[in-house]
Amino acid sequence: MKELIVNQEKRVSPELHYEISQFLYYEIALLDEWRFRDWLELLSEDLSYTMRTIVNAQTRDRRKSIQPPTTWLFNDNKFQLERRIARLETGMAWAEEPPSRTRHLLTNLVITETDLPDQFHVQSNYLLYRSQKERDEVFYVGKRLDCVRRNPKTDSWLICKREITLDQAVLTFHNLSVLF
């Protein structure tokens, strides 16, 4: 999914923007409450869930449209996320003992139409605060490009694609065991 260009003609109505925004706020509340099984229900079977870091490029290279290679931190599907969650539920995932306390913040949502009916792109900025033990605190900052589609069974929404790009070029945290 390419980075979205804000196109006034492709923007959704305020009512639809509100509906999709509320769905995404509900989704991050599930993650903060460690309700991972409920969260999985919001993901489509054909989900693509990726995270990469930003790569610093020299100005002269950007002018020539030379893109440095991307560093992928994960490239998961729904089955792989189910496995990650099953591991977290065992109590044996050392990186999450004791479990992290998280707060997901989502802002600047731009929602636009796609070529498919009932499917929309959502570009947003996020901040994920993670606290664990007494002194371990981490901030993950970046942008998300989501694709959501209407679930014909429930008339709600499903996330069918999520691309997460961290703003950090160098990762200084111990692990990536939390969900974005």
Swiss-Prot record:
Catalytic activity: 3-phenylpropanoate + NADH + O2 + H(+) = 3-(cis-5,6-dihydroxycyclohexa-1,3-dien-1-yl)propanoate + NAD(+); (E)-cinnamate + NADH + O2 + H(+) = (2E)-3-(cis-5,6-dihydroxycyclohexa-1,3-dien-1-yl)prop-2-enoate + NAD(+)
Coiled-coil regions, chain positions: none
NCBIfam families: 3PPDioc_HcaF (NF042947), PRK10069.1 (NF007479)
Protein family membership: Belongs to the bacterial ring-hydroxylating dioxygenase beta subunit family.
Oligomer and partners: This dioxygenase system consists of four proteins: the two subunits of the hydroxylase component (HcaE and HcaF), a ferredoxin (HcaC) and a ferredoxin reductase (HcaD).
GO terms for biological process, alphabetical: 3-phenylpropionate catabolic process
Keyword Ribonucleoprotein among record annotations: no
Enzyme class: oxidoreductase
Gene: hcaF
EC number: 1.14.12.19
Stored PANTHER family: 3-PHENYLPROPIONATE_CINNAMIC ACID DIOXYGENASE SUBUNIT BETA (PTHR41534:SF2), BLR3401 PROTEIN (PTHR41534)
Pathway(s) where this gene product acts: Aromatic compound metabolism; 3-phenylpropanoate degradation
Record keywords, A-Z: Aromatic hydrocarbons catabolism, Dioxygenase, NAD, Oxidoreductase
Keyword NAD among UniProt keywords: yes
GO molecular function per UniProt: 3-phenylpropionate dioxygenase activity
Gene3D superfamilies: 3.10.450.50
InterPro entries in the cross-refs: 3PPDioc_HcaF, HcaF, NTF2-like_dom_sf, Rng_hydr_dOase-bsu
Biological function: Part of the multicomponent 3-phenylpropionate dioxygenase. Converts 3-phenylpropionic acid (PP) and cinnamic acid (CI) into 3-phenylpropionate-dihydrodiol (PP-dihydrodiol) and cinnamic acid-dihydrodiol (CI-dihydrodiol), respectively.
Protein name: 3-phenylpropionate/cinnamic acid dioxygenase subunit beta
